[in-house]
Amino acid sequence: MEPIPAPAIDLISLAPVLVLSVFGMMVLVTDLFIGKDKSILVFISLTGLLMAAISSFAKYNLPVFSFNGAYVVDHLSVFFTFIFCISSALAILVSVDFNKREGIKVGEYYSLILFCTVGMVLLASSTDMIMIFLGIEVVSISLYILAGIQRKNTKSNEAALKYFLLGAFATGFLLYGMTLIYGSTGSTKLTIIAKVISENKILSEPLMLMGVVLLIIGFGFKVAAVPFHMWAPDVYQGAPTPVTAFMAVGPKAASL
């Protein structure tokens, strides 16, 4: 039995993801050992975002392929990584006074924003449905918790529950659609799927068509696109104001 070759992994191309993950965990650990003054957590979070933005420019010979082509760093993904880091940094800065006033536990708050940024970076560089699904779920789970981070606020709890239930509903559609597309094309890579569709004209086949429809429905719910946006007003109203601003910008751009 021949051994399965390991996919090529370029750690430099993964630098923004690794940096954000490390700093997200660093924020959580630091929060356990400091007193009431949590200002150092803001500094750590912003430093992590700055280093991630800088590290996204570490590769000059673009595009760079990793994980057997499932993760691609090109000029577009570098641009969006920079945009995501800026939007996350702004979300942290506008949250400082709000968190103090509302008594929010900032360790979890800042780390979740960093982990959400990890998911957005994955989405911007993904060329495989499995990687896309992974990025979407990292973003979604982070936002579920951020929406309900005001645990004593009933509106925040309601927003988090609605967001979680509808998000799980959308995930089911998304995953089922990806499964049908994989069954029709035999691949999860977007480039191969596009090639199979163009060469074999299978877009009109029932299995493929149903997969595309379910995929559109799942993405529509995730990005609050019409007519799948009915959950957005209630969730945006109940979530903390800085979280609402963050949800309306970065994750939407990443999904699109």
Locations of the language-model features?
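Alpha-helical transmembrane segments of multi-pass membrane proteins predominantly involved
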Residues: 1-256
